[in-house]
Design a protein with these regions (language model features):
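Extended alpha-helical targeting/anchoring segments
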Residues: 1-238
Length: 238
């Protein structure tokens, strides 16, 4: 089991916004995550999170679970009747214990994609994998650092996971927060737009969705298609 103890510090939170700090952190710490709250008026649901510097992760894709641990150990396990996605997630979670102030905030950050329904229900999903952007169906990451904004109290908390005998790096993070400079990139598209469906095929999908709604099969039906193009810049500047 991997054991961590938290190191924490609270700062005034009215001098920064989640987006402004994320723009500072994204270049220093790749794979940072931002979860921003839009409710600043009450004590509930008033927290925003920035998580950075991954230490462990679990991903599920192509019928396989990949578990990556803080010591560099990596385990790939095929999913089936005797070992499901839920078993992989439970196994991964049981490998960690976090104690200390703010430990209740130190969960996993990630996503479960729509296509992951096939790992939990007997619903067939057509496989579609793009060689340039084959994101996992399920991906959750344990991060070393969290910045927690309490918009109701105007507080900013730094939470760090420290292994046994490891000194904290709170001061280094605080210095980065106080830095007034961050990179800015102009966003622009390059070349022609690409899609996996033609315009007419997509229109027919929409017409089919309208027919299902009118017939009463569903109350809401959303139709999507993949659109891609080369870009210069960063996604946060879009």
């Amino acid at each position: 089991m991997y054991r961590f103890t938290t190191a924490t510090k609270k700062l005034l939170g009215d001098l920064h916004t989640p987006v402004s700090l994320y723009l500072k952190l994204r270049d220093v710490y790749p794979q940072s995550a931002l979860l921003e709250s839009s409710d600043y008026h009450g004590g509930e649901n008033s927290l925003s999170f920035i998580a950075f510097r991954p230490v462990a992760r679990i991903g599920v894709n192509n019928g396989e679970a990949l578990l990556e641990y803080p010591d560099g150990r990596s385990v790939a396990k095929p999913l089936g009747e005797t070992y499901a996605a839920a078993d992989a997630l439970k196994e991964f979670l049981n490998e960690f214990r976090v104690d200390g102030d703010g430990s209740e905030l130190c969960g996993l950050f990630g996503y479960t994609a729509f296509d992951a329904v096939r790992y939990f229900e007997n619903i067939p999903v057509r496989e579609f994998h793009h060689r340039d952007s084959d994101a996992p169906d399920i991906c959750y990451i344990l991060y070393k650092f969290l910045l927690v904004f309490d918009h109701f109290k105007n507080e900013l908390s730094i939470v760090e996971l420290c292994a046994d005998g490891e000194r904290d790096h709170i001061r280094e993070v605080e210095t980065l927060i106080e830095d007034r400079n961050f990179a800015s990139y102009n966003f622009r598209t390059v070349g022609e737009r690409r899609s996996n469906l033609t315009d007419e095929t997509y229109r027919e999908m929409v017409r089919q969705g309208v027919r299902h709604c009118l017939r009463g099969d569903v109350m809401l039906c959303k139709k999507f298609r993949c659109i891609g193009f080369a870009v210069n810049g960063a996604h946060a500047d879009y």
